[in-house]
């Protein structure tokens, strides 16, 4: 991404910001939604440069080659939107941390992710000039688990796309909705057991086998427009995850005015405040009771991606200065 400082600061020399877009491979995952929202709203010209690396080992090898080259190519700032990044950097490094689940519960992840993260996460965060946390909850964990100085962390909450509003078509039927990459921490087995009637599930399959209960309708990946229809028509969103650093589906449902059932702890209360029904994600009866108590909130937006882009661009400006 070519970021021109004169666009914001009255004719100062241009800066060049390199952004690792590898997470876009995950399509609908939260990290991909974050990166897509950021890239779409940065007020700078964008130039895409491709480095082929299809396997994990080739990706690591490519990182070893291309990250050091950024300084030679004149980059002023490097932004890694996940933990994947250099262990040292001659260019000021920005790292976005979405959560620390891989350190808190490594058993939720496959062997490659566990091994790589145990090695990489502390080193990448240590190398960063600035760490962006998507919530105050994630900031606290960075301080507590990795001893990151609080002054090095900026909290920039996630946002939702403009399509998520209460106005518009609704999906038909009587159903509860679950949204997210299908992996153990998303707690789908308990959610399905708690839902009486149809549960529609939006998301790609991640790691960890998930059996298909008879009341579950798998929708896979859907467009934002279709997802907004599903939020508007749902009896409620059931987002009883065992752990989250933010929870973009909660923010999307809130923007659509969809009733929300979500977990105590993690960052969900930070996102939804008093506009959700909170449950114990480890207790099926608690989730079932929460679904029965769910209420329709007054629609509101946590933030817009333009806000996220402005805050992030200000960090680039500061580090390049």
Located regions from the model:
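Carbohydrate transferase catalytic cores enriched for Leloir-type hexosyltransferases
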Residues: 1-321
């Amino acid at each position: 991404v070519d970021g021109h400082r004169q666009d914001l600061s009255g004719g100062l020399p241009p800066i060049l910001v390199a952004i690792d877009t590898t997470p876009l491979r995950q399509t609908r995952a939260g990290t991909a939604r974050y990166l897509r929202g950021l890239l779409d709203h940065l007020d700078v010209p964008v130039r895409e440069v491709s480095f082929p690396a299809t396997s994990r080992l080739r990706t690591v090898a490519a990182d070893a080659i291309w990250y050091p080259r950024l300084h030679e190519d004149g980059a002023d700032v490097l932004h890694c939107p996940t933990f994947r990044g250099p262990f040292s950097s001659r260019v000021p490094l920005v790292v976005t941390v979405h959560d620390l689940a891989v350190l808190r519960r490594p058993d939720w992840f496959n062997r490659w992710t566990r091994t790589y993260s145990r090695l990489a996460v502390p080193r990448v965060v240590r190398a960063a000039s600035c760490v962006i946390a998507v919530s105050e909850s994630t900031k606290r964990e960075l301080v507590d688990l990795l001893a990151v100085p609080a002054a090095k962390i900026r909290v920039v909450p996630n946002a939702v796309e403009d399509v998520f509003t209460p106005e518009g078509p609704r999906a038909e039927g009587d159903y509860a909705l679950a949204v997210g990459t299908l992996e153990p921490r998303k707690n789908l087995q308990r959610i399905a057991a708690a839902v009486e009637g149809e549960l529609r599930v939006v998301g790609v399959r991640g790691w960890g086998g998930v059996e298909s209960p008879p009341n579950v309708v798998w929708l896979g990946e859907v467009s934002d427009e279709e997802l907004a229809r599903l939020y508007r028509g749902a009896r409620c969103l059931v987002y009883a995850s065992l752990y989250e650093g933010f929870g973009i589906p909660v923010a999307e449902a809130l923007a659509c005015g969809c009733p929300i059932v979500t977990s105590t702890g993690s960052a969900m209360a930070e996102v939804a405040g008093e506009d959700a029904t909170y449950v114990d994600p480890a207790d099926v009866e608690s989730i079932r009771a929460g679904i029965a108590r769910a209420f329709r909130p007054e629609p509101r937006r946590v933030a817009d991606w333009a806000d996220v882009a402005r805050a992030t661009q200000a960090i680039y400006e500061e580090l390049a200065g």
